[in-house]
Regions:
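Short helices/loops that flank or line small-molecule/ion binding pockets
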Residues: 72, 77-87, 164-175
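C-terminal regulatory
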Residues: 104-175, 180-205, 223, 231-236
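Short beta-strand-centered segments that line the small-molecule binding cleft or hinge
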Residues: 77-112
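Short amphipathic alpha-helical coupling segments at ligand-binding clamshell hinges
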Residues: 4-11, 52, 217-231
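Short, well-ordered beta-strand segments
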Residues: 36-42, 91, 139, 178, ...
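Basic, amphipathic "hinge/linker" alpha-helix immediately C-terminal to the N-terminal HTH DNA-binding motif
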Residues: 1-19, 26-29
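N-terminal winged-helix
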Residues: 32-63
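A bilobed periplasmic-binding-protein/Venus flytrap-type ligand-binding module shared by bacterial periplasmic
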Residues: 115-119, 207-218
Length: 236
C-alpha cells in the first residue's frame, strides 16, 4: 500500500470499529449483548491456575449466548498491534514494552525459572557457578530486545523462538537452556525431565496485564468480559 492507501485503510478500520461499537451499545440498551468479541492471549496460559481465563469465557458465553467469541493466540507484540488497530477488542499477556493508545490493567505476576533437561551436561551437576550458566547456549524469545536478554543475565542467545512450546522443545533437546513459566514446565519437572538452574539468581516474575484500546473500555461487550475476568481473579 502507498502511504495514502495505508492511511485510508487505518481510517476504515477505525470507522468500522466505531460502527460495531455503536451497534453493541444499542443492543445493550435493550438488555442484550450481541456481536463479536475478539480476544487475544499469549500462548501456554491454559495451565496457569492464576489466570482464570477459561472460566471467565465460560461464564461470559453462558450469560451472553448471542455473542460470537473469536480467540487468537499471539506474541505480546502482535497482541498489542491487534488491540491498537481494533482487530482485537481485548488481550492478555506479559508486555515488556508498551504502545501508545492502549490501556494496561495489571492482573498478576507469572513465575519463570531457567531450566535444563536430562540431556544437558549441567543436569547432574549440583553446585554450578553463575558464570558457567551464563556461558551455556541459551534460547531467547523473538520479542525480547537485547536489553531484555541482558536483564535475564545473558549477553546473547544461541536460538530464538516465538512460542513457549517451541522453547520447551529446544530445552528438552538438551542443546540449550531456557526460561519457562513454572506452571508450564511443572509436568516435565515432576517426571524428572527438567530441572531449575540457580533459582535465586535466574528466576523472575513476568507481570501480566489486560489491555484494551484507549476509549473502548466502556463498550458493553468489552466491559462485561473485563468485569467477569476481574470477578474470577478476586475469588479465593
Amino acid at each position: 500500500l502507498t502511504s495514502k492507501g495505508e492511511l485510508f485503510h487505518q481510517e476504515t478500520l477505525r470507522l468500522l470499529g466505531e460502527l460495531e461499537g455503536f451497534e453493541q451499545y444499542a443492543a445493550a440498551l435493550k438488555g442484550e449483548l450481541r456481536g463479536t468479541l475478539n480476544l487475544g492471549v499469549i500462548d501456554s496460559t491454559v495451565s496457569d491456575k492464576a489466570l482464570p481465563f477459561a472460566q471467565a469465557i465460560g461464564d461470559y458465553s453462558q450469560e451472553h449466548p448471542a455473542v460470537h467469541l473469536h480467540l487468537s493466540v499471539m506474541s505480546p507484540y502482535e497482541l498489542q498491534l491487534g488491540v491498537q488497530d481494533n482487530r482485537l477488542d481485548l488481550a492478555i499477556g506479559a508486555f515488556s514494552t508498551r504502545m501508545s493508545g492502549l490501556v494496561y490493567q495489571p492482573l498478576y505476576r507469572e513465575q519463570h525459572w531457567l531450566y535444563c533437561s536430562t540431556r544437558h551436561p549441567l543436569f547432574a551437576e549440583r553446585r554450578i557457578p553463575e558464570p558457567v550458566i551464563t556461558q551455556q547456549r541459551m534460547v531467547g524469545r523473538g520479542y525480547w530486545s537485547q536489553a531484555e536478554l541482558a536483564r535475564h543475565g545473558f549477553k546473547h542467545s544461541a536460538a530464538t523462538v516465538d512460542s513457549m512450546e517451541a522453547q520447551l522443545i529446544l530445552v528438552l533437546s538438551g542443546a540449550y537452556i531456557g526460561y519457562l513459566p513454572e506452571h508450564y514446565a511443572e509436568p516435565w519437572v515432576e517426571k524428572g525431565d527438567l530441572r531449575v538452574l540457580l533459582p535465586a539468581t535466574f528466576g523472575y516474575q513476568a507481570p501480566f496485564s489486560m489491555i484494551v484500546r484507549r476509549g473502548r473500555s466502556r463498550e458493553p461487550l468489552i466491559q462485561t468480559f473485563r468485569d467477569l475476568l476481574k470477578a474470577q481473579l478476586n475469588q479465593p
